[in-house]
A protein has these predicted regions:
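Soluble or luminal CAZymes and related metallo-dependent hydrolases
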Residues: 51, 128, 306, 389, ...
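Nucleic-acid-interacting cores, centered on viral/eukaryotic replication and modification enzymes
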Residues: 145
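Conserved "HGTGT" condensation-loop signature of ketosynthase/thiolase-family condensing enzymes
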Residues: 1-121, 138-142, 152-262, 266-267, ...
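Short helix/loop segment immediately N-terminal to the Walker
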Residues: 407-413
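Nucleic-acid nuclease catalytic cores
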Residues: 148
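Short coil/turn segments at secondary-structure boundaries
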Residues: 120-128
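Active-site histidine-anchored catalytic micro-motif
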Residues: 131-132
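Glycine-rich and small/hydrophobic secondary-structure elements
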Residues: 384-391, 395-399
Length: 544
């Protein structure tokens, strides 16, 4: 296939993370009512495989309503969030269930032949939506197909055929699937704790950055709220940001800045042919990156090597002409390494003279940014159904290029093309992805010089799997001399205050560790940062 043939368009999409009325009704009465609804079979429609099917049927309906001929679609790439843990199904079981529904439905007549259904197993966790998207790109670029569908569903409440739901604590453990098993076992590390520690380190690194991100979060939620008032939001949380309880859940991580558990679906139709007229949106770059599952093995807790690799690869493929052409960014989440890494790489590559903090505070980048409009869909902080999240963000970017779905039309000249970036974070930056879209007049988009190439998922997935296996087998970490205290985080629980902390090595790496409450209480009464500390190979503070 020649370089000029490597063209993929986003033709349309769907998304919906709004909690169904059924869930609101069933959960309002607490666990007893939820159990009763489940035993009566009334919760079936919110199982992950049901959301997947609902997303597909709505995507087909949308394409037909738009007059798009999908009969040449030969593959449907599907996924559900944490299939083993949340849905309690294997990937092949999900695919078989989908195939059965398709064979028995009226929708099969929309296709010349029954499409194959693919569900690629992955460790990508919260970034897993980029995997079926990447598979669809490979369908079109490497397997000479003309159209490919991407559909994902998820229910992070854990409602499935075997149970009415799981507890938030169990969900937190599942979300930590890409955190080093050794760190989880000995330091009780998880996503919230690592996120809080990273935020604490960011406070020390650049307090103005935190102020910028807080303002950014408020503006994102406000924009989502305004879309919802007009009935146009696909998000889960759409309340006014000032009505959201600004409660610290793990110091200094606040409720308003975190992504709520969600249920819903998202889908896209990708094709090698553009729309017959008007504006077109094309995929021009995609990248992936993986990093060590333990922060002990990373050069920095604030800058994501995985995200940097993903963004850099996507940029090389997309061949943006300059900073002025980058108009839209949809961040997976706003705290803190996603925008810090993503924007650092983008702004440096495109010649911006200033820091990420300056770009945000000066409103060069923001929801109403002078140069780049960022985070208008709200990202994961307004609803995180895991696998569908990246697909929803891609759909929101698509709508912004078309000036549809409540987004104002971009001010583009007749031959001008705008670019947009979408980030996807797996775990605490263990498995990240990035995509770049281009939008504009059909003829201008068609002639772009891009070098789109799907990433090698099997390679990245294998690297991650080997790392997780090695961490699971680890009996003791190598602890360097000269460690000092970096940051102490804590949360209030029914059993009392629970602590989590990181120690810093002389070369700048962070080690998670735990100690007794009395040890941390004494330290918090002092200016503890930089205090010498010793920790054991199993990440316990040597007290006394």
């Amino acid at each position: 296939m020649g370089q000029t043939d490597r063209v993929v368009y986003v033709r349309t999409g769907v998304a919906n993370f709004k909690p169904p009325p059924l869930w609101e009704l069933a959960s309002a009465g607490g666990s007893k009512t939820l159990q009763e609804f489940w035993e009566a079979g009334k919760l079936r429609e919110i199982y992950a495989e049901e959301f997947l099917w609902a997303g597909f049927t709505r995507l087909v309906t949308e394409t037909l309503n738009q007059g798009i001929d999908i009969s040449r679609t030969t593959t449907i790439n599907v996924a559900v969030s944490y299939p083993h843990e949340m849905a309690q199904m294997r990937e092949d079981e999900v695919a078989e269930d989908f195939c059965r529904r398709l064979a028995e439905s009226e929708y099969r007549t929309a296709f010349r032949q029954t499409p194959r259904v693919r569900f690629t197993p992955t460790h990508a966790a919260s970034a897993s939506g980029i995997v079926p998207f990447n598979d669809a790109l490979a369908d079109l670029l490497e397997r000479d197909e003309k159209m490919s569908m991407v559909v994902a569903g998820g229910n992070t409440k854990g409602t499935n055929r075997n149970r009415p739901r799981i507890s938030p604590a169990e969900t937190t453990d599942i979300f930590a699937s890409l955190v080093s098993p050794f760190d989880r076992r000995h330091a009780k590390a998880n996503m919230l704790k690592l996120g809080a520690a990273a935020l604490g380190r960011a406070y020390q690194h650049d307090f103005d950055l935190i102020k910028a991100l807080e303002r950014f979060i408020h503006a994102q939620r406000l924009y989502t709220h305004e879309l919802a008032r007009r009935g146009l939001s696909t998000a889960h949380i759409t309340t006014h940001p000032d009505s959201i309880e600004d409660r610290t859940i793990l110091h200094p991580l606040k409720l308003r800045g975190t992504g709520p558990q969600s249920m819903g679906y998202a889908g896209l139709l990708l094709a090698t042919q553009p729309p017959p007229a008007g504006r077109a949106v094309r995929v021009v770059g995609i990248g992936c990156g993986v990093d060590a599952s333990s922060i002990r093995d990373r050069p920095s807790h604030l800058f994501s090597q995985a995200m940097a690799s993903a963004v850099s690869t996507a940029l090389v493929q997309a061949r943006l002409p300059g900073l002025g052409s980058l108009k839209v960014l949809e961040h997976h989440n706003p705290y803190p390494a996603v925008p810090l890494t993503e924007l650092t790489v983008l702004l440096k590559a495109l010649g911006y003279r200033g820091s990420v903090t300056q770009a945000l505070l000066q409103n060069d980048i923001g929801v109403h940014g002078r140069m780049i409009c960022a985070g208008r869909s709200g990202g994961a902080q307004v609803g995180h159904a895991i696998t569908p999240t990246f697909i929803r963000l891609t759909f929101e970017t698509f709508k912004q290029f078309l000036g549809a779905g409540g987004y104002p039309a971009l001010d583009l000249g007749p031959d001008e093309v705008a670019y947009g970036g979408i980030s996807s974070v797996g775990g605490h930056h263990t498995f990240d992805g990035y995509a770049i879209l281009a939008g504009g007049r059909r003829e201008a988009v068609a002639t772009l010089d891009a070098a789109l190439e799907p990433f090698d998922h099997d390679h990245f997935n294998g690297v991650t799997e080997r790392d997780l296996e090695e961490q699971a087998a680890l009996t003791g970490a190598v602890i360097p001399d000269g460690m000092t205290l970096g940051f102490i985080s804590f949360q209030e629980t029914k059993e009392g205050r629970e602590y989590f902390a990181i120690a810093r090595t002389p070369d700048g790496r962070d080690f998670p560790f735990v100690a007794s409450p009395a040890f941390f209480t004494r330290l918090l009464e002092t200016a503890y940062i930089g205090t010498p500390i010793r920790i054991s190979p199993t990440l316990q503070a040597v007290e006394g």
